[in-house]
Regions:
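Nucleic-acid nuclease catalytic cores
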Residues: 88-119
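N-terminal targeting/trafficking signals and adjacent low-complexity tails
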Residues: 6, 65, 72-74, 95-100, ...
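Short acidic/glycine-enriched loop/turn segments that link adjacent beta-strands
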Residues: 40-44, 107-109
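Intrinsically disordered, low-complexity terminal regions enriched in charged/polar residues
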Residues: 110-160
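Mg2+/Mn2+-dependent nuclease catalytic core
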Residues: 66-89
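Acidic-basic catalytic patches of nuclease active cores, encompassing PD-(D/E)XK
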Residues: 1-40
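Hydrophobic, Leu/Ile/Phe/Ala-enriched alpha-helical segments that form helix-helix packing faces
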Residues: 23-32, 50, 86-93
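Conserved catalytic cores of phosphodiester-cleaving nucleases, focusing on short active-site segments
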Residues: 46-69
Length: 160
């Protein structure tokens, strides 16, 4: 039974990474052009370098981990998928170093990147920032995490 459970978990994690890869590619295909270098995606990291359409700086985006947390608010389970990314501009004068969180909001087709150093990730703080919703993500559909934080706190945001 244990191996069966592990197999299910492993399969789910593999699916999560595949979905993460797909979303990252879709999101940044619109915002970033000329993918200069891409390394193979693995279960531990996903790394590629791309240049923006509006400037020549190159960004290295490394997905450190993908994990899911569950928060309960007003009887609804909000499924939160976080893509932790270390983003660093190759131009030292403009560098932005640190750990960032990429929040995907399929319901509203929005994405946000937050600087984790500027946001308290404890449950209470996250719940205070959530916009109330009346629908929650189906646990079988990894593509439907529902979370919205104030866009004014986002480093970068956009639609897809």
């Amino acid at each position: 039974m244990s191996s069966s459970i592990n197999s299910v978990i492993e399969t789910q994690e593999t699916n999560d990474y595949a979905i993460g890869k797909h979303i990252i590619e879709r999101l940044f295909k619109d915002k970033l052009s000329n993918i200069v270098k891409r390394e193979a995606y693995s279960a531990t990291d996903m790394l590629f370098t791309a240049s923006t359409k509006t400037r020549e700086s190159h960004y290295s985006i490394e997905i450190k981990s993908i994990y899911k947390d569950y928060y309960k608010e007003e009887g609804f389970i909000l499924k939160v998928s976080k893509w932790l990314a270390a983003i660093q501009d190759s131009d030292a004068r403009d560098s932005t170093e640190g750990v960032f969180a990429l929040y995907i909001v399929p319901k509203y087709r929005r994405w946000y990147i937050y600087n984790l150093r500027q946001i308290n990730l404890n449950t209470a703080h996250l719940q205070n920032k959530m916009i109330k919703v009346t629908q929650y993500a189906d646990t079988q559909k990894v593509l439907t995490p529902i979370i919205l934080l104030y866009t004014s706190e986002a480093v970068v945001s956009g639609a897809y």
